[in-house]
């Protein structure tokens, strides 16, 4: 089981949804410091987060995932402030299929950039002590999503990156493990305007099916994801659907 005592946690993402619920629940652990990284600060939500556990130092760092320089500068400041990073949770997610650049940048390339720039503060051969990176994907990273093809491409990319970085050779050298979470349909801001964010205008029936489907609450999904993290399975992928946790066993199609 993962020991949260004295850990420095970095969260890259918004002030809502599953990722934010994870932060609220992690504040109840005996962690040392929590750093929130996002393009805009929500002062009220930061105060609420701090109030959960006044003994944890909570800080905010502005960072734009669409700008490499912003990521580099913000992650350097966060790493120096903490000294080292134990846990990094990449929880940013947008569903804007008509804006390919933003969808890929916010969901995938920005996540990759921020992770790679955090690694010097996690890698035990550099300034880190080892740790864990958790990347938020989706069930649409495992299956096709005809109504949201661009979003699905980004989600598939997250899993490819996570599984590759979760190779045992990388873990043995760096001490950093990687995991991916694939939530199913969840009550969140992301799915409030589905009809405006489809890939094609031929997707009405697919959107209707999603809108009428049952959804889990972000709180229950967050709880299960933290449970998965505590199992410490490097390179693993987890589905969290309707509050139930299930590990994904990928099919091996090719091996060198």
From Swiss-Prot:
One of its GO terms (cellular component) is cytoplasm. GO terms for molecular function: alcohol dehydrogenase (NAD+) activity; nutrient reservoir activity; oxidoreductase activity, acting on the CH-OH group of donors, NAD or NADP as acceptor. NAD(+) binds at residues 10-34. Pfam families: adh_short. Keywords: Oxidoreductase. The keyword DNA repair does not apply. InterPro entries: ADH_Ceratitis-type, NAD(P)-bd_dom_sf, SDR_fam. The active site is at 151 (proton acceptor). Substrate binds at residue 138. Belongs to the short-chain dehydrogenases/reductases (SDR) family. This is Fat body protein 2. It comes from Drosophila melanogaster.
């Amino acid at each position: 089981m993962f020991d949260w005592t004295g850990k420095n946690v970095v969260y890259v993402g918004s002030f809502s949804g599953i990722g934010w619920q994870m932060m609220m629940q992690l504040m109840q652990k005996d962690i040392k410091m929590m750093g929130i990284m996002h393009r805009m600060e929500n002062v009220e939500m930061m105060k609420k987060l701090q109030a959960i556990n006044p003994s944890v130092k909570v800080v905010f760092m502005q960072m734009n995932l669409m700008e490499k320089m912003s990521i580099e500068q913000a992650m350097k400041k966060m790493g120096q402030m903490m000294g080292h990073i134990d846990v990094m949770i990449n929880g940013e997610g947008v569903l804007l299929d008509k804006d390919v650049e933003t969808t890929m940048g916010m969901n995938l390339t920005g996540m990759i950039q921020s992770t790679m720039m955090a690694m010097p503060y996690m890698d035990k051969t550099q300034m880190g002590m080892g740790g864990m990176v958790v990347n938020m994907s989706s069930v649409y990273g495992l299956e096709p999503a005809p109504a949201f093809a661009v979003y699905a491409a980004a989600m598939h990319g997250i899993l490819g990156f996570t599984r590759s970085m979760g190779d045992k050779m990388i873990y043995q050298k760096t001490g950093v493990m990687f995991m991916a979470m694939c939530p199913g349909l969840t009550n969140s801001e992301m799915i409030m305007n589905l009809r405006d964010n489809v890939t094609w205008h031929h997707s009405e029936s697919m959107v209707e099916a999603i809108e009428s489907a049952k959804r889990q609450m972000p709180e229950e999904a967050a709880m299960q994801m933290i449970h998965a993290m505590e199992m410490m399975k490097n390179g693993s992928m987890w589905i969290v659907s309707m509050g139930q946790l299930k590990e994904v066993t990928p099919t091996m199609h090719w091996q060198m």
